[in-house]
């Protein structure tokens, strides 16, 4: 694991900040904002457990690493800020403003570098899942279960997946129906209300909906209940 930030490094960072030289630090300097992000990412990868799920386990692991790394950076910022307040207490308001303005910029840079890393690795995994089919079943009193299918079509946001559902009603369908995520024992996890145009019996229905990736990791089937 990469070296964690120690008290000596924090004090060195404050000293550099005091002279306004942080921007000129080399890339391999422990006080560089890029290094903050790199260390947080390494700490996350060493600390976060893998997620045992064939379809979305890697994406959930990446998201958990992102949250861990964000907290690692946030905790270090909090500690550093407290030491900075003590260090600059005798400086003028103008000097304090300039110092903390630079500190804010470096905070944003560290978070940005970290997010860029996880966005990139997430997108690589998302591409592999586009078009994947989900295990699905439908209400046989309302739909032809042999023609029911669901697949992943896109990832609209971090930890969000877009699903395309195809159903064929066996009787006239109104303008809405329910989709229920269930676990492997068919116990309900979460319902979604889907709106659609009324359909005739035998008329194919296609609906897209967004849902959290975390729910898919627990789901073995999707049930559709007309109403």
Residue ranges and their predicted role:
Residues 187-227:
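Short, solvent-exposed, Trp/other aromatic-anchored flexible loops in extracytoplasmic proteins
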Residues 97-104, 108-158:
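Transition segment at domain starts
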Residues 45-91, 98:
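Post-signal-peptide N-terminal segment of Sec-exported extracytoplasmic proteins
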Residues 178-182:
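Beta-strand signatures of extracellular beta-sandwich domains
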Residues 26-28:
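Bacterial signal peptide processing site
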Residues 169-175, 215:
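A short beta-turn/strand-edge loop motif at beta-sheet boundaries
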Residues 2-12:
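Bacterial N-terminal signal peptides that target proteins for export
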Residues 21-24:
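C-terminal motif of bacterial Sec signal peptides marking the signal peptidase cleavage site
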């Amino acid at each position: 694991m990469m070296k964690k930030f120690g008290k000596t490094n924090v004090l060195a960072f404050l000293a550099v900040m005091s002279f306004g030289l942080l921007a000129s630090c080399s890339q391999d300097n422990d006080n560089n904002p890029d290094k903050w992000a790199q260390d947080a990412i390494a700490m996350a990868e060493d600390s976060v457990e893998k997620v045992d799920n064939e379809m979305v386990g890697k994406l959930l692991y990446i998201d958990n690493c992102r949250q861990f790394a964000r907290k690692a950076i946030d905790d270090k910022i909090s500690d550093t800020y407290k030491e900075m307040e003590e260090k600059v207490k005798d400086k003028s308001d103008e000097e304090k403003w300039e110092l903390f303005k630079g500190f804010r910029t470096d905070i944003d840079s560290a978070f940005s570098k970290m997010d860029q890393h996880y966005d990139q690795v997430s997108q690589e995994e998302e591409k592999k899942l586009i078009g994947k089919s989900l295990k699905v079943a439908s209400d046989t009193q309302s739909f032809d279960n042999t023609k029911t299918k669901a697949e992943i079509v896109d990832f609209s946001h971090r930890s969000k997946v877009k699903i395309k559902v195809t159903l064929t009603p066996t009787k006239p369908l109104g303008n809405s129906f329910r989709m229920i995520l269930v676990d492997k024992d068919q116990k309900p996890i979460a319902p979604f209300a889907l709106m659609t145009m009324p359909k005739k019996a035998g008329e194919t229905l296609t609906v897209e909906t967004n849902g959290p990736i975390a729910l898919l990791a627990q789901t073995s089937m999707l049930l559709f209940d007309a109403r």
